[in-house]
From Swiss-Prot:
A motif (Arginine finger) lies at residues 642-645. Residues 458-667 form the MCM domain. It is found in: Nucleus; Chromosome. Hyperphosphorylated during mitosis in a mechanism requiring cdc2-cyclin B and other kinases. Undergoes dephosphorylation after exiting mitosis, existing in a partially phosphorylated state in the cytosolic interphase mcm complex which associates with the pre-replication complexes (pre-Rcs). Complete dephosphorylation inactivates the mcm complex, preventing its binding to chromatin. Becomes actively phosphorylated during S phase once the mcm complex is assembled on the chromatin. This chromatin-associated phosphorylation occurs during the activation of the pre-Rcs and is independent of cdks. Residues 54-64, 84-99 have a biased composition (Polar residues). InterPro entries: MCM, MCM_4, MCM_CS, MCM_dom, MCM_lid, MCM_N, MCM_OB, NA-bd_OB-fold. Acts as a component of the MCM2-7 complex (MCM complex) which is the replicative helicase essential for 'once per cell cycle' DNA replication initiation and elongation in eukaryotic cells. Core component of CDC45-MCM-GINS (CMG) helicase, the molecular machine that unwinds template DNA during replication, and around which the replisome is built. PANTHER family: DNA REPLICATION LICENSING FACTOR MCM FAMILY MEMBER, DNA REPLICATION LICENSING FACTOR MCM4. This is DNA replication licensing factor mcm4-B. A zinc finger (C4-type) spans 306-331. SMART domains: MCM (SM00350). GO terms for cellular component: chromatin; CMG complex; MCM complex; nucleus. The lineage of its organism: Eukaryota, Metazoa, Chordata, Craniata, Vertebrata. The gene is mcm4-b.
Amino acid sequence: MSSPTSTPSRRRNKRGRGSNPPTPHGEEVQSPPSQRRRTEDSTSIGELLPMPTSPSGDVQSPSGQELLFSSPAPSRHSAHQSELDLSSPLTYGTPSSRVEGTPRSGIRGTPARQRPDLGSARKVKQVDLHSDQPAAEELVTSEQSLGQKLVIWGTDVNVATCKEKFQRFVQRFIDPSAKEEDNVGLDLNEPIYMQRLEEINVVGDPFLNIDCDHLRNFDQDLYRQLVCYPQEVIPTFDMAANEIFFERYPDSILEHQIQVRPYNALKTRNMRSLNPEDIDQLITISGMVIRTSQIIPEMQEAFFKCQVCAFTTRVEIDRGRIAEPSVCKHCNTTHSMALIHNRSMFSDKQMIKLQESPEDMPAGQTPHTTILYGHNDLVDKVQPGDRVNVTGIYRAVPIRVNPRVRNVKSVYKTHIDVIHYRKTDSKRLHGIDEDTEQKLFTEERVAMLKELAAKPDIYERLAAALAPSIYEHEDIKKGILLQLFGGTRKDFSHTGRGKFRAEVNILLCGDPGTSKSQLLQYVFNLVPRGQYTSGKGSSAVGLTAYVMKDPETRQLVLQTGALVLSDNGICCIDEFDKMNESTRSVLHEVMEQQTLSIAKAGIICQLNARTSVLAAANPVESQWNPKKTTIENIQLPHTLLSRFDLIFLMLDPQDEAYDRRLAHHLVALYYQSEEQMKEEHLDMAVLKDYIAYARTYVNPRLSEEASQALIEAYVSMRKIGSGRGMVSAYPRQLESLIRLSEAHAKVRFSNKVETIDVEEAKRLHREALKQSATDPRTGIVDISILTTGMSATARKRKEELAQVLKKLIQSKGKTPALKYQQLFEDLRGQSDAAITKDMFDEALHALADDDYLTVTGKTVRLL
């Protein structure tokens, strides 16, 4: 590290190479005498920005070598602040950007990285508290007195006082209402944020998240200033946090200076209630991310070079505008400055579209959306489908009349510069496969969950805790519980065997009013990445993806649908039978391959859709007809039904004893107290933690005994139908048994699938087949109803009828043409069983397929 006693001329030349950012109003900060004299003596281009709010000076090291952003040795503590530039809140930048080992470092062409989420760096005029005029030089005797007398123009923020208050908050605040599960690994009797700084020193992640609720409880005036003037106050917080950190850990090395990120602002606004009074204030809104753009490079500092004399200068961006130098300050040539892109400094930027959460929407309204801009480290932190609480600064920018003309309209468009994301939803399960959402469990919580898993009746207790307001349907609840746990995801693509899905698909079908939609709503409100849609109100592109023109870039972009948004979650589809054919056809690939192939408008890609499908369907005749098969009742293609692991019937039994028990249960929901309800069922928070822990940390594998049991189960299922000449099981049924067995092992927190898991999977699968794949004429389970759409007995009857019809035609002699109606009546007359017109048509088509006859209009012609 260079010595602070280097010659002033070298220091001035180093600093003078860049030009200062323009002020919004054209004013400059009043300098203290020591710095003003240094500025007057300077012969370099530009001016030295004063630092009235902090003893640290904005003075760069004169060394030609770059420096690491670390604290100096303890013996040189006096030089610490002048060398490191812990960032002025008025000319805000990160000192580490000119150092080695940090992004975009090395060449002077990559200067100080500012925080784009707070807006660009700018000079801020300070005024005397007791005067309308700017502070005069003769009134200022020292930097300390300046900090005590002045506030930032347009605000009531005194930087020295603000910094002192925040340092006191960080060093002293202890949250009396803190919960251990929310502060894992922290001592709740010690200052919370000092422990957070210690974490930064250990981990090296230079971000300090501040709960605004803590700040409000500690100092309401400081909290008010933060909400009203975030662009001025947050840099002051940054400076205070860095001073505390490097005084405590002088040898620490960070990527860049610590950035304070406040969240949980009390000024939490509904997206609809944002109005002009919130502009440039700190707000918190919640919603669901529906689209994220690609990473956009945004210029932070422009590098200009004179084409005549090769003089260079830098211009910092102010609110998205570049003040291009019109005259070269060295040779006074006009319009000779050219922008050098590879010497300019850029930052990462991403546009995120946030949609209003369904629970925040008023009745009968369409959801509102707003645009977010994430910068640098906040890029790619959220994905479409995430539910987030966003803390940021509400901005308004004018709209240009024409992109090529600088004239602007009087109408402004708004966006939010993101400062903090918080992906938490207390009502839902904790997410999986996402580092930011993985639930951290305390040792006590894990011990309690493992103790719960050791109980022999844990499977029944968890199933009873699922939708306790819905009466009975125990097997259906157990099936949905296994769907929530899911199987083990296996990838054998390196051996050429491909990937095997772990998601369980379930279809509920039956009479109206049997709580099918209630179960779907319960699951939707429980899972983190769930989507709820209705079959009648969904289109094929709404479920998959569609191409639209980006309003910002005017380019064609892919907008994802419900199935892609519910990746790693559950997609609940109600009114499944009312979906049109084109919409249902897109589900075939999703439910088996777990991917979605798109080829639209020149965009060809394959999206992940690793989602479980929970669907509900009503019968065509509004009431289940026991004389018809499942296919005939709900009119769904057998190719789609065969992809469901479990198909349950929810029928109204029309039994007086059942009706009495159901009525007693419904009435009890109204008169029982909450304490009684809690005693009967498992706590909802425990259920969510239990499922989240199992999905994250338990990955069961098949044992030798379980493998043999699965083989025997599959072979026995095949044997059932072999004697009658029909197929009663397919490989898909075996894969379903494996997934259900793995899910049941997860319920027990077991990393090995045992025989008891296979037995329960067999029982549940058999119960579902008894309901959905039973031939109504014979009462025998026939899996071919779901796989081919026709039972074996129906197929046999069709063949027999075709043979009878063939004999009837042969008995009529060599007649080339027969009347359709006459032939039908003759067949009905000689048959003992009732023959419908549909059966007659099927027999004719069977003979036509054998090239025996052809049907033309109302005439049957022999071939």
